[in-house]
């Protein structure tokens, strides 16, 4: 279903002559119901096994589960996030299936960027600060520190390792909550870009010139 598994992308594919099969309630958790997909021209299929059996191309978000790997056919094309580096069993299963697998996280654009990984990284970066702030609360057995401080109290120190998409988005939330933010990255050029973005709201350090224990 293109880069986004939405009714709009289904409509585009159908208009180009493709047949699109959607698993029953497959879009429910993302806020899309069966009728939206049907109105876009998709066929709603009750069982995932039937989709794996009939489709030439499988489009997913999460890596194939063990039961799904067993359903993948030879030469079937599978688009999804795979993260195979830490998944030996999944890797071996896909190799055995002789299918063609394209991992979203490895697709690059003309500038060498990872456009399909960036949205997930942005979410991860923003959520990390929220989760950290939550864990600092006393009722979570934290130190009882507010990320942005309070009258008479210092704000929390937030150390961000890496200034990529994850780090940048973590900094957006951390600076927005008025924490003290340090960003460490190996690239001097990237750190300069971040300073342009955040100004004096952050302190930057090159990773080969800093003692993390002192931050």
Predicted segments with their positions:
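An N-terminal-biased, well-structured beta-alpha scaffold segment characteristic
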Residues: 3-93, 97
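Short gly/ser/thr-rich secondary-structure transition/capping motifs
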Residues: 39-45, 60-62, 138-144, 203-209
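Residue-level detector of alpha-helix initiation sites
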Residues: 63, 123, 164-166
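Glycine-rich phosphate/diphosphate-binding loop of Rossmann-like nucleotide-binding domains
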Residues: 3-31, 141-215
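Short, hinge-like loop/turn segments at secondary-structure boundaries
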Residues: 38-41, 119-122, 199-203
């Amino acid at each position: 279903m293109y880069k986004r598994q939405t009714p709009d992308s289904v409509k585009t594919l159908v208009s180009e002559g493709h047949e699109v099969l959607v698993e029953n309630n497959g879009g429910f958790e993302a806020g899309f119901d069966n009728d939206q997909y049907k109105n876009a021209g998709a066929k709603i299929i009750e069982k995932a096994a039937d989709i794996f059996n009939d489709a030439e191309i499988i489009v997913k978000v999460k890596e194939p589960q063990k039961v799904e790997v067993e359903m993948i056919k030879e030469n079937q094309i599978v688009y999804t996030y795979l993260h195979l580096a830490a998944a030996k069993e999944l890797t071996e299963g896909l190799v055995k299936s002789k299918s063609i697998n394209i991992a979203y996280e490895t697709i690059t654009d003309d500038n060498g960027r990872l456009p399909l990984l960036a949205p997930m990284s942005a979410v991860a970066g923003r959520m990390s600060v929220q989760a950290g702030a939550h864990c600092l609360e006393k009722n979570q057995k934290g130190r009882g520190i507010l990320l942005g401080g309070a009258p008479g109290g210092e704000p929390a120190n937030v150390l961000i390792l890496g200034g990529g998409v994850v780090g940048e988005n973590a900094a957006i939330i951390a600076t927005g909550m008025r924490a003290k933010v340090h960003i460490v990255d190996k690239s001097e050029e990237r750190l300069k870009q971040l300073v342009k973005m955040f100004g004096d709201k952050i302190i930057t350090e090159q990773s080969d010139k800093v003692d993390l224990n002192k931050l």
